[in-house]
């Protein structure tokens, strides 16, 4: 061991002894100045056993003399342990690197690619010395990379998954009385819901700060809403549908009595309630997808099973008996 190495070891021991009592002080004091951070790359923690220092930081904080090939830098970690790294400039790659001692630091701290190493500088307190004569010291710290969990419980986190991928997407609110807790879903629905959130399907969930859930509908959902005048989200493939507050009008009550007759070669059902001889007549023999309803009053209407309003193509209204009398038939039975 040569004299220069002995002097460095002796100086390092003195720094360790004089700064051990001030470890917590430095890491909680404003006198510790932050220099820079370095996010580790795979090569920084690989078999090359070297840490590349960004050029702007190296020239600013660790400058080398023109005729100097390298030097030794000493750092103290938050536990008070001293670390010594060989610092030099590589002409082949034109980069500043820390080599000797770095692999041991990586192994002991269990560093991986994506972790961050931070460098600080300060000085050892000495009330008897002038500020410019105080012994300077540098610090090194580390922190692991931020972990990202892609599957979250929707009751505990406010994240956005599966945002719509089409430009005409809209978000529709789901009122609390119609929203089902996530844990109340059967296990099959829970698994399907998590998979769709992770894979980023064309519809998703947004939970804002006040706990109101929103679901993004597809263009087909918007088509139904324009035609039906409703605002209930449409979610496909085993995902429960959450209706909004507005409920479509129900069908008219069933008539109490029904009479059948044949009119113009068509079976006609005459229903009456409360003793009224004239009432609602449904014309049989038509397609169930487009029912025809004959009403003799102008005040009421009802929707077909598809939610379509009865129109001139699917319903006929007779204001009186003149239409039947004109054709030679009477409505009276």
UniProtKB/Swiss-Prot annotation:
<dbReference type="GO" id="GO:0003677">
    <property type="term" value="F:DNA binding"/>
</dbReference>
<comment type="function">
    <text>Regulates lateral organ growth. Functionally redundant with NGA1, NGA2 and NGA3.</text>
</comment>
<protein>
    <recommendedName>
        <fullName>B3 domain-containing transcription factor NGA4</fullName>
    </recommendedName>
</protein>
<keyword id="KW-0804">Transcription</keyword>
<keyword id="KW-0805">Transcription regulation</keyword>
<feature type="compositionally biased region" description="Basic and acidic residues">
    <location>
        <begin position="323"/>
        <end position="333"/>
    </location>
</feature>
<dbReference type="Pfam" id="PF02362">
    <property type="entry name" value="B3"/>
</dbReference>
<dbReference type="InterPro" id="IPR015300">
    <property type="entry name" value="DNA-bd_pseudobarrel_sf"/>
</dbReference>
<dbReference type="InterPro" id="IPR003340">
    <property type="entry name" value="B3_DNA-bd"/>
</dbReference>
<dbReference type="GO" id="GO:0009908">
    <property type="term" value="P:flower development"/>
</dbReference>
<dbReference type="GO" id="GO:0003700">
    <property type="term" value="F:DNA-binding transcription factor activity"/>
</dbReference>
<keyword id="KW-0539">Nucleus</keyword>
<feature type="region of interest" description="Disordered">
    <location>
        <begin position="268"/>
        <end position="333"/>
    </location>
</feature>
<dbReference type="GO" id="GO:0048366">
    <property type="term" value="P:leaf development"/>
</dbReference>
<dbReference type="GO" id="GO:0005634">
    <property type="term" value="C:nucleus"/>
</dbReference>
<dbReference type="InterPro" id="IPR044800">
    <property type="entry name" value="LEC2-like"/>
</dbReference>
<dbReference type="GO" id="GO:1901371">
    <property type="term" value="P:regulation of leaf morphogenesis"/>
</dbReference>
<feature type="DNA-binding region" description="TF-B3">
    <location>
        <begin position="36"/>
        <end position="145"/>
    </location>
</feature>
<keyword id="KW-0238">DNA-binding</keyword>
